[in-house]
């Protein structure tokens, strides 16, 4: 296991209800990536955009080569196939980890899920399937963060096996989106710099998001 390598999987909602926040989302994502580049740690990034389809735009790219996200990639449309996006991400990363030599496997895997609404269009994975997948990967030390707007994020996270202290309900406005990416960026930076390969996300990771009220 390579304790110096972090795999970051970012699952980002681009369904129609995200309309009006495209520029804020793009700006926040790009700032987060720039933050990781500045830190200089070994981070591979997988970015998955989802609506009623799942689109992988970065497939384990070293963070230093990632180009800024633009409106060509991030544009809103469609419904919310959240379970399909999460299931696809886990199976893909799980396959990679299993087939790499032991010394090339990431010591830390962080899956960040952001959505502004409830699941409503998945066709390939059920809630129970995803819950079991997440529970199994948590046993291997993977961390999952769930950020949700317009929903009870803690309740929805628990349905798929993510603890409440790894979830947060955010305000779906410009400032709320900005705080989301800042919080995730800090959490990832601390995790990438940590020597430990378990429990590398701090429990206060979402405090700034929680204190913001529109």
Regions found by a protein language model. Give the residues of each.
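Acidic, low-complexity intrinsically disordered regions
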Residues: 1-214
């Amino acid at each position: 296991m390579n304790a110096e390598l972090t795999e970051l999987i970012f699952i980002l909602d681009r369904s129609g209800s995200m309309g009006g926040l495209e520029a804020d989302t793009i700006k926040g994502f790009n700032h987060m990536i720039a933050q990781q580049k500045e830190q200089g740690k070994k981070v591979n990034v997988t970015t998955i955009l989802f609506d009623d389809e799942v689109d992988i735009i970065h497939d384990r790219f070293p963070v230093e080569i990632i180009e800024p996200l633009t409106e060509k990639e991030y544009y809103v449309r469609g419904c919310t196939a959240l379970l399909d996006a999460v299931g696809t991400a886990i199976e893909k990363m799980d396959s990679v980890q299993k087939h790499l030599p032991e010394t090339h496997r990431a010591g830390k895997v962080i899956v960040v899920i952001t959505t502004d609404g409830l699941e409503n269009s998945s066709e390939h994975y059920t809630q129970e399937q995803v819950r079991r997948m997440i529970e199994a990967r948590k046993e291997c030390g993977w961390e999952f963060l769930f950020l949700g707007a317009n929903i009870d994020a803690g309740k929805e996270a628990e349905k798929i096996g993510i603890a409440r202290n790894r979830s947060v309900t955010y305000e779906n406005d410009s400032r709320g989106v900005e705080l989301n990416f800042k919080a995730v960026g800090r959490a990832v930076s601390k995790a990438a710099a940590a020597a430990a390969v378990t429990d590398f996300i701090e429990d206060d990771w979402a405090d700034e998001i929680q204190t913001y009220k529109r």
